[in-house]
């Protein structure tokens, strides 16, 4: 087997825009700036919004004039 062909792992810091700092190991040799992390993402903080997909379906049916009889 060849020696020294694997990339070298180094410890870097990933800094989020909310101020959270995460230390990780990576093959890149520079620090990262993140837009969003688990501490500020709406899914993890419980502040997520519900998207109204029912309105889109009704608009599609209206546009193409589908009725319940045609769909069955």
From Swiss-Prot:
GO molecular function: metal ion binding; rRNA binding; structural constituent of ribosome
Residues annotated as binding Zn(2+): 16, 18, 37, 40
A GO biological process held by the record: translation
UniProt protein name: Large ribosomal subunit protein bL31
Lineage, highest ranks first: Bacteria, Pseudomonadati, Pseudomonadota, Gammaproteobacteria, Enterobacterales
Top-level division of the source organism's lineage: Bacteria
Organism: Buchnera aphidicola subsp. Acyrthosiphon pisum (strain APS) (Acyrthosiphon pisum symbiotic bacterium)
Subunit comment: Part of the 50S ribosomal subunit.
Gene3D superfamilies recorded: Ribosomal protein L31
Family in the record: Belongs to the bacterial ribosomal protein bL31 family. Type A subfamily.
Cofactor(s) of this protein: Zn(2+)
SUPFAM superfamilies xref list: L28p-like
Cofactor note (record): Binds 1 zinc ion per subunit.
Cellular component aspect of the GO annotation: ribonucleoprotein complex; ribosome
Pfam families in alphabetical order: Ribosomal_L31
Alphabetic keyword roster: Metal-binding, Ribonucleoprotein, Ribosomal protein, RNA-binding, rRNA-binding, Zinc
InterPro entries recorded: Ribosomal_bL28/bL31-like_sf, Ribosomal_bL31, Ribosomal_bL31_A, Ribosomal_bL31_sf
Stated role: Binds the 23S rRNA.
PROSITE patterns: RIBOSOMAL_L31
